[in-house]
UniProtKB/Swiss-Prot annotation:
<dbReference type="InterPro" id="IPR020613">
    <property type="entry name" value="Thiolase_CS"/>
</dbReference>
<comment type="subunit">
    <text>Heterotetramer of two alpha chains (FadJ) and two beta chains (FadI).</text>
</comment>
<keyword id="KW-0442">Lipid degradation</keyword>
<dbReference type="InterPro" id="IPR002155">
    <property type="entry name" value="Thiolase"/>
</dbReference>
<keyword id="KW-0808">Transferase</keyword>
<dbReference type="Pfam" id="PF00108">
    <property type="entry name" value="Thiolase_N"/>
</dbReference>
<feature type="active site" description="Acyl-thioester intermediate">
    <location>
        <position position="99"/>
    </location>
</feature>
<keyword id="KW-0443">Lipid metabolism</keyword>
<dbReference type="GO" id="GO:0003988">
    <property type="term" value="F:acetyl-CoA C-acyltransferase activity"/>
</dbReference>
<keyword id="KW-0276">Fatty acid metabolism</keyword>
<dbReference type="InterPro" id="IPR016039">
    <property type="entry name" value="Thiolase-like"/>
</dbReference>
<dbReference type="InterPro" id="IPR012806">
    <property type="entry name" value="Ac-CoA_C-AcTrfase_FadI"/>
</dbReference>
<comment type="similarity">
    <text>Belongs to the thiolase-like superfamily. Thiolase family.</text>
</comment>
<dbReference type="InterPro" id="IPR020616">
    <property type="entry name" value="Thiolase_N"/>
</dbReference>
<feature type="active site" description="Proton acceptor">
    <location>
        <position position="392"/>
    </location>
</feature>
<keyword id="KW-0012">Acyltransferase</keyword>
<dbReference type="InterPro" id="IPR020617">
    <property type="entry name" value="Thiolase_C"/>
</dbReference>
Length: 436
């Protein structure tokens, strides 16, 4: 076990999250079809500033992430600053940690506040799976570079004459891991088989996610943290996430065919999170700065931890490695938590992590700990549904989870919450949040 590591400034100030906001999330090629991630980021940051009631001149820094990169706007953070009327002197840089990207943005801001280099900052992320960087083949790319160096038309024509018809076809973004060639769904299948996660249990978790998310919207619990989005030509308002199945039944899930292992698999489109568009952001500052501005804290960041594991086997077990570290650094145990929110990339991955939380064998053999952190009380787990229902704009999910958990803790009268996620590349993230 590691020692507690308080997240406080030299003056003893805690890290405050004052406000959080997101756009409604939308399935690929639906509500935000044609809207790039940078525009989604501008929308949410502009509205967050308006709702927070502070001058944009006070923002020292914006740290923002994007996983599906736009070649024409590689630093999405700076483009958001320039496109929202914020001061041109506001520092801005971009981060990427796959599905844990906005967790990283929040951690970076927290570290800057602790170091004293930043007083007030915004952290978040945005992604679009509808506006994708479509590439060209390696053969065509090399020919284009060589042609740019050619001195005559005949030299250029000679270069292009070597190309085959297939070299001219567009190349879609890769969905597999660069280092292994494995898709995340392949790893989810492997974990389902390794840890005995049945198709029935996966479908049941997916149904639960949709039912709880539908209830959250019906009860009005998400209205304050999800803005209304207006997209050109501004004829319709987007007010809710459009992936949530409000009236699905378990029998419908059983009808879907496996998506990755077609013959023997159990991971389907229904028990996986879909490709999604959206953006989310949080406003952060030191505790004394919030008091000076008269801004009540939504909550506090108690601790965070990141993990990295093997990518060939169990790549999506990041939460099982990062969570014990975050708990130790906060000086608490799993039993102290009021809420637990885990990113549902796949139902199989989620259920496998829950098993590892409770496994003494895993704790001893993989973590070097004498015992497991504990079995999760499902009455505390993903109480408003998860990513299977809401969707997963890669860089925005962490900020969604943080805001959602803080608001739900406040609605319940306070307490401690865990937000945790797996990420491509064998990465994991975990954060402990507190509401008084």
């Amino acid at each position: 076990m590691s020692k507690p590591l308080p997240l406080v400034t030299r003056q003893g100030d805690r890290i405050v999250i004052v406000n959080g906001l997101r756009t409604p999330f939308a399935k690929q090629a639906t509500a935000y079809h044609g809207v790039p991630a940078v525009d989604l980021g501008k929308i949410v940051v502009s509205e967050l500033l308006a709702r927070s009631g502070i001058s944009s001149e006070l923002i020292d820094q914006l740290v923002f992430g994007q996983v599906v990169q736009m070649p024409e706007a590689p630093n999405i953070a700076r483009e958001i600053v320039l496109g929202t009327g914020m001061s041109v002197h506001t520092d801005a840089y971009s981060v990427s940690r796959a599905c844990a990207t906005s967790f990283q943005a929040v951690a970076n801001v927290a570290e800057s506040i602790i170091a004293g280099s930043v007083d007030i900052a915004i952290a978040g992320g945005a992604d679009s799976s509808s506006v994708l960087p479509i590439g060209v083949s390696k053969a065509l790319a090399r020919t284009l570079v060589d042609a740019n160096k050619a001195r005559s038309l005949s030299q250029k024509l000679k270069l292009f004459s070597r190309l085959r018809l297939r070299d001219l076809l567009p190349v879609a973004p890769a969905v597999a891991e660069y280092s292994t060639g494995l898709r995340m769904g392949d790893t989810a299948e492997q974990m389902a088989k390794t840890y005995g996660i049945s198709r029935e249990d996966q479908d049941a978790l997916a149904l639960r996610s949709h039912q709880l998310a539908a209830e959250a919207w019906q009860q009005g619990w998400l209205h304050d943290e999800v803005m209304t989005a207006y997209i050109p030509p501004y004829r319709e308002a987007i007010i809710e996430d459009n992936n949530i199945r409000k009236d699905s039944i378990l029998a419908q899930y059983a009808k879907l065919r496996p998506a990755f292992d077609r013959q023997h698999g159990s991971v389907t489109a229904a028990n996986s999170t879909p490709l999604t568009d959206g953006a989310a952001a949080v406003l952060m500052m030191s505790e004394s700065k919030a008091k000076a501005l008269g801004l009540p804290p939504l909550g506090y960041l108690r601790s965070f931890a990141f993990s990295a594991i093997d990518v060939w086997q169990d790549m999506l077990l990041g939460p099982s490695y990062a969570t014990p570290l975050a708990l130790d650094r906060a000086g608490i145990t799993l039993a102290d938590l009021t809420l637990i929110d885990m990113h549902e990339a796949f139902a199989a991955q989620t259920l496998a992590n829950l098993k590892m939380f409770a496994s003494d064998t895993f704790a001893r053999e993989k973590l070097g700990r004498s015992q497991a952190i504990g079995e999760v009380d499902m009455s505390k787990f993903n109480v408003l549904g998860g990513s299977i229902a809401y969707g997963h704009p890669f860089a925005a999910t962490g900020a969604r989870m943080i805001t959602q958990t803080l608001n739900e803790l406040r609605r319940r009268g306070g307490g401690l919450g865990l937000t945790t996620a797996c990420a491509a590349g064998g990465l994991g993230a975990a954060m402990i949040l507190e509401v008084e």
